[in-house]
From Swiss-Prot:
It is found in: Nucleus; Chromosome. This is FACT complex subunit SSRP1. Keywords: Chromosome, DNA damage, DNA repair, DNA replication, DNA-binding, Nucleus, Transcription, Transcription regulation. The keyword Transcription regulation applies. Component of the FACT complex, a stable heterodimer of SPT16 and SSRP1. Residues 470-566, 598-642 are annotated as: Disordered. The keyword Phosphoprotein does not apply. Residues 629-642 have a biased composition (Polar residues). Belongs to the SSRP1 family. Pfam families: HMG_box, PH1_SSRP1-like, POB3_N, Rttp106-like_middle, SSrecog. Residues 558-626 bind DNA. The lineage of its organism: Eukaryota, Viridiplantae, Streptophyta, Embryophyta, Tracheophyta. It comes from Vicia faba (Broad bean). One of its GO terms (molecular function) is histone binding.
Amino acid sequence: MTDGHLFNNITLGXRGGTNPGQIKIYSGGILWKRQGGGKTIDVDKTDIMGVTWMKVPKTNQLGVQIKDGLLYKFTGFRDQDVVSLTNFFQNTFGITVEEKQLSVTGRNWGEVDLNGNMLAFMVGSKQAFEVSLADVSQTNLQGKNDVILEFHVDDTTGANEKDSLMEMSFHIPSSNTQFVGDENRPSAQVFRDKIMSMADVGVGGEDAVVTFDGIAILTPRGRYSVELHLSFLRLQGQANDFKIQYSSVVRLFLLPKSNQPHTFVIISLDPPIRKGQTLYPHIVMQFETDTVVDSELAISEDLYNSKYKDKLELSYKGLIHEVFTTVLRGLSGGKVTKPGNFRSCQDGYAVKSSLKAEDGILYPLEKSFFFLPKPPTLILHEEIDYVEFERHAAGGSNMHYFDLLIRLKSEQEHLFRNIQRNEYHNLYGFISSKGLKIMNIADAQQAVGGVAKVLENDDDDAVDPHLERIRNEAGGDESDEEDSDFVIDKDDGGSPTDDSGADVSDASQSGGETEKPAKKEPKKDLSSKASSSKKKSKDADVDGVKKKQKKKKDPNAPKRALSGFMFFSQMERENLKKTNPGISFTDVGRVLGEKWKNLSAEEKEPYEAKAQADKKRYKDEISGYKNPQPMNVDSGNESDSA
């Protein structure tokens, strides 16, 4: 890069653990983005007060201190990067980089260096450890010589972090020369007073600034009393209690539901809160849109004038979701995202769709897509590799819907299914306006109708782009030999493709003669004197036979009952892809087959129960099924509220 340097796999150290990401150091400052989206650190060059290098195990750590006292630590630089970046900081920012050394002697006595809001424990001239005073929640004097620092403990944590720092004790003898005391004010008291003057100790207190009772939260599900304190928010429910520091709040979303008296308010967190083994990066709240509240903020006049005068008012009266968002924004400093220019066919802000096995609504926003309510899925435009519009392979009522596949640069895919067909013009126009790559309509863009050429094709024999793409990807990996490790039930019909098991009709599953390549009959010798017209006639006859065979499929036939393995595959496939990025199509089937084979009868029971219920459903539907006469399929002008 001529303007700076770009590095991948650089971790940011923080109270919630380490987060990998990408850092850009350029003439305007420093920009770090977390891998997979979430937290972003943007430091302007005018805010940089100092830069340090430290050699840590296996790599190098870059420390950047800014004007407000914060210190960011970026780890993962090579030795050759140290030289190039040191010269860059000197030549571009005019900053001389300081080199720090890490103490590895194991001594627990030394001196304390207080700089900004950082406390560094020094052993000789080397640093043993460093903590941020912004994370200190309380200080206590124990006896005459001991000071205990208590750190903020909340329910946010890194995905791989099991432990967090709760408290630390310092022993300051009366003979200490750095913090000199007297008989009435010992050295430990001098040290504690110094910490309290630098740390934001006690901010937030025990009293809430404002409380919202009986708020419905969809993720994590429950009804909670939401308390907004000065430095954190608390969710108090009957079974759960979450405390969340405002430093973990990345962004707020205010998204109305179309034709329904509810509004979503989403709090995006980094790091997320944890409940058991489940991480919740998004708190999804649902407010009644027409509810009006009158709230007074419990903030002292002095504190309000000194810190919050430009951010908050002392009293609010208005719609509950607007009051909640305004107060939370003022306290946390988080930005609020609202719906942008997209409008559905009913002039709403979202479209109905399904993700995995869950029905919900998809919000196309100015810089992202957001699927709600469960599982809440945020997809940033900058992380998208391409999108595909996919028509359903079956006919009948399914022709009123299409799917939207979003593939990320990380090769992860999100398939939003069963979107009403009369929404595709709005979606196509919106996606095109954002400059996102659309894979399967590059040729159709130049023709009249554009995406309509793909989605409005009523030919039941048309190719499903998603299914065809999966087959093409799998074709290069499949071998001629049968995989003996892949053992399934006789009626499974093989490993299903992504999300295909729930949507294919009975005709498409049972039509083995049309799915398998037909055996080629030996060609008969043709007379050299045969006219070309006879050859064309013969070819036409062959094509006619093939088309007649294809028409044996009935798109209106009931969906065939799925086996227990098919239900198991649908549940496990996405998890398998997440834990094994880049796994091939055939390996997915093999691993799922092995997992199914190793399950006990008790573990298979819930899947077999679903299979029995589906079998009964199929039996009931097929018993009353009659092959209908051909009929015209309506283009689909009806629409449900998004």
